[in-house]
Amino acid sequence: MTRAPVVIKLGGSLLSDPHDGRLQRWCERLAGEAAGSAVIVPGGGAYADAVRDAQTHWRFSEDAAHRMALRAMDQCGLMLCDLFPALLACDDIDALADHCAAGSTPVWLPSRHLDLSTDLPRDWTVTSDSIAVWLAARIGSPRVLLVKSCALPDGDLTALAAQGIVDPHLPQIATRANIEVRLAHADSPF
């Protein structure tokens, strides 16, 4: 029986400094020695921040902002695949396991599957954190690793959500889906 790949969410904050080497280290490791064992879920980075700013300015709906944030994740994923050609952009959930079995490291682009889905709240209580857990449940992976650039205090997911370290919906979806969620600092060894 083939083991399900781990879902690794690379926070959008990893994309903020192209010279610090953290993003490069994680992507090269995931595309190299860990190839075939992980699916990457990209954060939305500056693209998602732009959606938040535009929503504040224009006051468009949470639903529209959610759909735009999904595309922000797609944009970051496409950028990762261009910067690190060993990574493989994939918008088809059903193909992720096949790509891993073939020894590739897919980067999941979520808008195709989640654009009109009602599986998750369609507002800012859901970010790429909860989306990574949703994907893990969907592909049968029992665990998710969230890679963050911020300080990671001790605490359960509810405490981390209260501190803004993870999104507010994460504790609920992780418990409901029975997914183990771990956090790693971007500077930590893989």
What are these regions (language model features)?
Residues 1-189:
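Nucleotide/pyrophosphate-binding catalytic subdomain
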